Amino acid sequence: CELRLHLAATHTQLGYPSVAPERLPGFAYRTSERFGLTSNWSERHVAFVAGHGTFGLSDALITRWGKAVRFGSVVARINLPVTPRAYGDDHHAWCLWYAKGSCGACAKRCPADVITTANGHDKQACFTYIRETTTPYATATYGTGATPCGLCQVKIPCEANVPAALINQI
């Protein structure tokens, strides 16, 4: 998180006004009638727009490097060339379930059963599971306030890369 602030400050000092939106006081989570639990800034959506990946059935970002990535963003007033997106505007292009109607491995891996091929990812139910189950376990077992789970992102075809059946889109 501090890296984003450092980059924004450095760009600003160089004459390119910049902010790290997720670090601004106005950043917040909200409940949307249409989308459930949401925030007013999404690092995943910025990564999609920047050409780094598309969304899977679990709502996680599938990148060239798989799902085990972290993104942070800095928005700057600076003229840069546009990065073409290998997947165009298809926000589900690198997910086997959405692209070919096969897979659903992430749904099978979910211990809370909150990902289904019929309805996708229930963010509120996932959030509740993490807060009520995995966070207390991690706190008691490891003494950390981390909010772990992520089982839907491992031991699946898109864990470490774009699935082979979709690789031609890179």
Provide a role label for each language-model segment.
Residues 1-170:
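Catalytic cores of enzyme domains
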